[in-house]
Amino acid sequence: MKQSLFISLLLLFTNVAFAQDAKLIEAAKKDGKLIVYGTMQSDIFEPLQKIFQKKTGITVDYWRTSATKVMERALTEARAGKALFDLVMSTEDTQRIMLKEGILTKYESPMWKDFPKEAIDPQLGPRARNHIVGVMYNRSVIKPADAPKTLEDLVKPQYRGKLVMADPTLHTTTAQWLANLHKLLGKEKADKFIRDLAAMKPVLVESFAPAADRVTTGETPIGITYVYYVFLNGQKGAPVDYVRGDYRLLGDASYMSLFHKAPHPNAAKAFIDFFLDDESMNLMAKAGEFVNRKGVYPPVPDADKIKFVEMDDLGESFYAEKRKEFQKLFR
């Protein structure tokens, strides 16, 4: 089994009790297991699996992929009436689509009270984590003095052939990021930036993870990806950093939601309670996640200075139109 990068944190937290409803736990134990489809790195999720199993005896099976693929698999299984999963953990835009399709149901965890009211969606619950998108670069290939200083620097001629990003015709969150750039640059500058970015002929990959991997190896030294990969890949010795700019960075929220026909509903509810608990949130932050708790930051350089600008969910029909536009620009 793959060793967790955070096994020491697992040992630290195994003796910490989390408050849960006794009746729910008893019912959850009868379920015996639960299945989660999610986007969280396996190295971060694994300690949570082990802690929860140690506390409850309930097994957690986890399938990890991109947000788009989580959504696609969940919808395919649900439509076929052959769903195996209990919980989906993914970005807000994909959760909205699944909610609209009617496959998610509301579970109001007692842990909601520990989150700011403005961070709680009436249907999806607390915005547990913020996925912050930025520009990551390899310091061994691109010296800090030569690296882009702002987002707009990314399209300068010297970076042509050195860029990687998720394919916006396939990756929902990248399409969302491009469509929300006006929040940082204004509409006119954002439109020009997108055209210029496409003209740079970036390497297109499936999602943010392989984009970060290519930056880490230096194969493509600059990439658009989640900022937490700076910590995650840096922990493995990679010489990576991210472009600060004015610290305003777009991002998406992550939610964990209950499938409306969950095979193991009580175990799933118990896991949601555990996942939103203070100890779990702190564990995730120490592992590089931007959790939505005031004053709790990941060990990413200048994490406390980042000004999170939440991306709007623009709807499935909008993304369908945008994908056509991006197909012409990026392909």
Where are these regions (language model features)?
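A bilobed periplasmic-binding-protein/Venus flytrap-type ligand-binding module shared by bacterial periplasmic
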Residues: G134-V141, L178-H182, A253-A267, F275, ...
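Periplasmic-binding protein-like
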Residues: D114-K117, N130-H131, G161-T169, F193-A198, L204-V205, F274-Y297, ...
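Sec/Tat signal peptide C-region and signal peptidase I cleavage site
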Residues: F13-A19
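Extracellular/periplasmic bilobal clamshell ligand-binding domains
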Residues: P298-R331
